[in-house]
Design a protein with these regions (language model features):
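Acidic helix N-cap motif at the loop->helix transition within catalytic regions
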Residues: 14-17, 44-53
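Glycine-rich, basic loop-to-helix element that forms the pyrophosphate-binding segment
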Residues: 62-78
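Short, flexible, basic/aromatic active-site loop/helix in glycosyltransferases
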Residues: 114-120, 129-151
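A conserved acidic beta->alpha catalytic loop
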Residues: 22, 40-48, 90
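Acidic donor-binding loop at a coil-to-helix junction in glycosyltransferase catalytic cores
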Residues: 177-184
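Conserved donor NDP-sugar-binding/catalytic core segment of glycosyltransferases
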Residues: 95-126
C-alpha cells in the first residue's frame, strides 16, 4: 500500500524543514512505499529551494494561491493509494505513519483523521484547547449519528483513500480556507467511512491561534463548521496568512 504525503506550502521557509524532517524520519522504515510532495503555492521566499534540498522530495508548483488549489495540485501529482495531507507548520508525532498504514490495512476507510496538538502554548492555553476539542467531538457525534449531516476531518492531519477522493471529484477549490475540511468530510461521508480519532495526533504551530486570539479563532471555526455542514459553503470567505520566523521545538507529551 503506497502513501503519498502532500504538503501545501506558501512562504513556509521557517517551518517546512522541520515538517519534512519529521516525515522522512518515519518513511525511512517503509522504503518504496511512500512519496513526499511539497506544493509550492506561489511562495516568494526560499520554500521551493528548501524543499528541493531534501532527498526524495518532489516539488509541484501551483501558482493559484489558495489551500484547496494546493491540496488538489498535490493530489493530481501523487501516485499513492493513500493521500496524507500535512500542513507545512506541522510535524508527525512518533508512530504516526505506522498507525495510519496499519489502520488502512485492517479497515476499509474513506478517510482517517485526528486532532492537532499545539506545541507552543502555555499549559493553561492547552487546557482550553482540549476543552474546545471536547465540545467539537460532542458536536461531531450529534451531527453524524443523530442529525446525519456530516462528519469530521482535521484538515492538516488527515489521510484519504485515492478511490474515495476520486469519487467526490477531489478538493473543492471554490472554498479557499475556512470550511475546507468540513466540506470534504461531508462529501467523503457520502462515499465511505470517515473515521476521526483522538489517537492520531499531529504536532502543529499555534501561530494562527496566537495571532487571532483563542476566543476569536474558536468562534470563527465553529461558525464555519456549522455553515459549511448545513449550507455547503463557509460563512467566512477571506482569511489572513500568518507567517513568522521564530521556531519552537515540539515537546513530547507527558
Amino acid at each position: 500500500m503506497r502513501l503519498s504525503f502532500v504538503v501545501p506550502a506558501y512562504n513556509e521557509e521557517a517551518y517546512l524543514p522541520a515538517c519534512l524532517q519529521s516525515i522522512l524520519s518515519q518513511t525511512a522504515a517503509y522504503p518504496g512505499q511512500t512519496e513526499i510532495i511539497v506544493v509550492n503555492n506561489a511562495s516568494t521566499d526560499r520554500t521551493r529551494e528548501l524543499a528541493l534540498s531534501f532527498p526524495g522530495v518532489t516539488v509541484v508548483d501551483e501558482p493559484r494561491k489558495g489551500l484547496t488549489f494546493a491540496r488538489q495540485a498535490g493530489f493530481a501529482a501523487s501516485s499513492g493509494e493513500l493521500i496524507a495531507n500535512v500542513d507545512a507548520d506541522s510535524r508527525l508525532t512518533p508512530g504516526w505513519l505506522t498507525q495510519v498504514l496499519d489502520t488502512f490495512m485492517h479497515h476499509d476507510l474513506a478517510s482517517f483523521s485526528g486532532p492537532v496538538i499545539f506545541y507552543d502554548l502555555t499549559p493553561r492555553q492547552s487546557v482550553l484547547v482540549h476543552i474546545f476539542y471536547l465540545t467539537a467531538w460532542i458536536t461531531y457525534v450529534i451531527n453524524r449519528y443523530i442529525l446525519r449531516v456530516g462528519s469530521m476531518v482535521q484538515g492538516g492531519n488527515f489521510v484519504v483513500s485515492r478511490a474515495a477522493l476520486e469519487k467526490i471529484g477531489g478538493f473543492n477549490t471554490a472554498i479557499s480556507f475556512y470550511g475546507e475540511d468540513t466540506d470534504i468530510a461531508r462529501r467523503l461521508n457520502d462515499v465511505g467511512e470517515v473515521h476521526f480519532t483522538f489517537g492520531l495526533k499531529m504536532f502543529t504551530s499555534a501561530r494562527r491561534l496566537k495571532n487571532e486570539g483563542m476566543v476569536t479563532m474558536a468562534v470563527r471555526y465553529t461558525i464555519n463548521y456549522f455553515w459549511t455542514t448545513f449550507f455547503k459553503r463557509p460563512f467566512t470567505d477571506t482569511y489572513v496568512d500568518i507567517r513568522e520566523a521564530q521556531i519552537v521545538e515540539p515537546q513530547p507529551e507527558g
